[in-house]
Amino acid sequence: MATAVWAAARLLRGSAVLCARPRFGSPAHRRFSSGATYPNIPLSSPLPGVPKPIFATVDGQEKFETKVTTLDNGLRVASQNKFGQFCTVGILINSGSRYEAKYLSGIAHFLEKLAFSSTARFDSKDEILLTLEKHGGICDCQTSRDTTMYAVSADSKGLDTVVDLLADVVLHPRLTDEEIEMTRMAVQFELEDLNMRPDPEPLLTEMIHEAAFRENTVGLHRFCPVENIAKIDREVLHSYLKNYYTPDRMVLAGVGVEHEHLVECARKYLVGAEPAWGAPGTVDVDRSVAQYTGGIIKVERDMSNVSLGPTPIPELTHIMVGLESCSFLEDDFIPFAVLNMMMGGGGSFSAGGPGKGMFSRLYLNVLNRHHWMYNATSYHHSYEDTGLLCIHASADPRQVREMVEIITKEFILMGRTVDLVELERAKTQLMSMLMMNLESRPVIFEDVGRQVLATHSRKLPHELCTLIRNVKPEDIKRVASKMLRGKPAVAALGDLTDLPTYEHIQAALSSRNGHLPRSYRLFR
């Protein structure tokens, strides 16, 4: 027992000696309070004897240019170098729901769900994911009204594997009966989810496009209609793919890669490859130009029980009012983007903060003044041949008429005097949002791909910022006044008992003050 106590005491003494020694060299000389080594030196002055720090300079210019090469088969290869060991590479295709006029609506929706399934070289989606996993990669496919995008983010060292895989996924999908049946179920579930979701924004966006461009181009269904789910099969998909998945309608875009290496991979895997639907022959591409019609789409629905949790959500009626703006190829696109930011808006219970837009018009004039308004948000959708600026508002069904009048007044005010302070705030917020978004590699990839797909080149961020800075109050007034001369598009969802007629909404937007015409009832 005595031996054990003696050994423990010796061990503790040894530990104390070890702890007393400095772990890394000699202890630093530090003094505090009045005995400081550098007395009376304010924090704003550099310490004597300390090397001056060298800070990075910011000139607002991109360090790497966007390079574009067009191959012999018409495929465009675009790249933007970026620091880091990871890259984002993908294929963007000029296809989407706007090109389905001669087909069943919903093909693009099906292709989005079928992406990265079995191909000529890969037996299943799991095999594709395992291949990407070796390079730390993930994949995704998104379709919109005018673009389909297949993208992979992975280690830059695996660029060859990634481009090879993308080529196989895009050009050689198997589209087995089992996969198509699973896709039918996935589409059905997504449609059910859209109708049950408390946030109606995706559904309203679909409705406002249908109202604005009735049965043409961007007004065609973005989501597959229920009646078409069972009708879409491999033959229909191959017919669509043959016409729209051609090299001249594609861009291979990459961020964080060397341009020459990406071009080499494109030539190796995407030139001369025969797709699964056969050799390309005569194609039948829909080149229709969007025709804005205006109009109204109404969906009567009981919104009193959409809560998915224990906290009840109040019954609301949702209205979206829109007017035709311009395409992203026009010079007026930038003033419209600034106008949209100036309108801003959001939800009535959204937490504020710097850059949140709490001084935008829809907050100051609508949400702050009318406590019963639950939402007022401005959206701007722009395409290669048209655009749509709209305001989404939500309120209790009993106050629908008043809500619509408030929105029509805000549209009228767009064409009136623009305050310089609010304009500068909107321009600054738009530029900061642009630059912050472009700090993300996948966002840069999408920006490069979409711009090159539409214009064969890319405007760099500092060029866009210059255009934003040059927007004047008269530009906002001019584009707003031109927009207000068109017919409105209206989408309404919920209890629509007190919804004004389309003719009354159109009259309010044509008036000087935005007031709805009085409605008279013989019986109350």
Swiss-Prot record:
Which keywords, in A-to-Z order, does the entry hold? Acetylation, Membrane, Mitochondrion, Mitochondrion inner membrane, Transit peptide
Q: Which gene encodes it?
A: Pmpca
> Modified residue N6-acetyllysine is at which positions?
K298
The answer to whether keyword Glycoprotein applies is: no
Q: Identify its protein family.
A: Belongs to the peptidase M16 family.
Its Gene Ontology cellular component terms are: mitochondrial inner membrane; mitochondrial matrix; mitochondrion
What name does UniProt use for this protein? Mitochondrial-processing peptidase subunit alpha
| Chain segment of the transit peptide | 1-33
User: Which residues are recorded as modified (N6-succinyllysine)?
Assistant: K63
